[in-house]
């Protein structure tokens, strides 16, 4: 699998505020004064300069996120989210307010992050990884295997903030998703539904040039196969046969130049000997830009073969 990674110049700046005190030449000695206390400030978030540093940054962000969850640091968890953040899980879609109970109830213990892959797409940091953790929901144990996750970050007010998150950790069998507990903006929801429908219909109709044009360089995907990139997406579109996509409970939110679109998607697929059922499943797509120039930078599909 080839995953395109885009990196730009990076500077880690440390701010110092030294104070210097000078006495005039030949001045009479005076009682010693206490040195001025140095002031410190958290360096503003900046972009790494190479692939290794980009992955290191992504690893730090994901580990920090899961440590806050494991510590039940709900204040820290909330602070890491942008106001219009959305998260997709097997249960459905959540915004910052409605996600707090979900995150707390998971009872996350001993999270272990691996296989971190980071790409830069414009001002967005797209990250996929595998996470192994002890979690449960409604008394049901989630998979104890290392499962795919996807996150999208942006720099907001000098700090890395999450625009979207998706988890593919589920109990078996996967239950039917619930409708989101938040309504969102009707106009944005309609816009998001139209953009996602356009993408999925191009795949369904095998309009491959049009489909290809909607995929950003640096796109990352998580699905039942694991972590995928743009080339994998195109290869899958060529080989797969998909049912007519049906979107329900669509929610769309703006984070800078990103449109985070979620829904419960019903779209069966067949690829070689693998069949994905036409069951509703939470789905996430993050678009960058607007109109015909918009491109998808991140996709998470929680559906899987039975």
Predicted regions and their residues:
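Hydrophobic pocket/interface hotspot
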Residues: 65, 77, 85, 99, ...
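Short solvent-exposed beta->alpha transition segments
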Residues: 75-112, 212-246
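A mature extracytoplasmic/lumenal domain signature
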Residues: 81, 91-92, 117-122, 129-133, ...
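Surface-exposed, charged secondary-structure patches
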Residues: 100-143, 235-277
């Amino acid at each position: 699998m080839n995953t395109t990674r885009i990196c730009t110049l990076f500077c880690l700046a440390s701010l110092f505020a030294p104070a210097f005190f000078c006495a005039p030449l030949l001045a009479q000695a005076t009682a010693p004064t206490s040195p001025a206390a140095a002031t410190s400030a958290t360096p503003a978030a900046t972009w790494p300069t190479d692939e290794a540093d980009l992955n290191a940054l992504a690893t730090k962000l994901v580990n920090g996120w899961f440590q806050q969850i494991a510590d039940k640091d709900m204040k820290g968890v909330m602070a890491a989210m942008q106001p219009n953040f959305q998260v997709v899980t097997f249960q459905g879609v959540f915004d910052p307010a409605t996600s707090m109970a979900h995150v707390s109830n998971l009872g996350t213990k001993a999270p272990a992050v691996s296989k971190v892959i980071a790409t830069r797409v414009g001002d967005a940091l797209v990250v996929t990884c595998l996470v192994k953790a002890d979690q449960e929901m409604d008394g049901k144990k989630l998979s104890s295997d290392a499962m795919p996750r996807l996150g999208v970050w942006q720099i907001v007010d000098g700090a890395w903030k999450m625009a979207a998150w998706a988890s593919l950790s589920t109990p078996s069998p996967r239950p039917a998703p619930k409708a989101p507990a938040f309504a969102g903006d009707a106009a944005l929801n309609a816009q998001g539904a139209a953009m996602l429908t356009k993408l999925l219909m191009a795949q369904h109709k095998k309009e491959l040039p049009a489909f290809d044009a909607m995929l950003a360089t640096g796109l990352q995907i998580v699905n039942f196969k694991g972590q995928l990139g743009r080339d994998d997406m195109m290869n899958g579109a060529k080989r797969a046969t998909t049912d007519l996509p049906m979107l329900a409970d669509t929610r769309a939110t703006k984070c800078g130049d990103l449109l985070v679109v979620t829904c419960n998607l019903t779209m069966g697929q067949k690829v070689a000997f693998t069949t994905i059922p036409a069951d509703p499943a939470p789905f996430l797509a993050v678009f960058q830009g607007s109109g015909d120039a918009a491109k998808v930078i991140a996709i998470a599909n929680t559906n899987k073969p039975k």
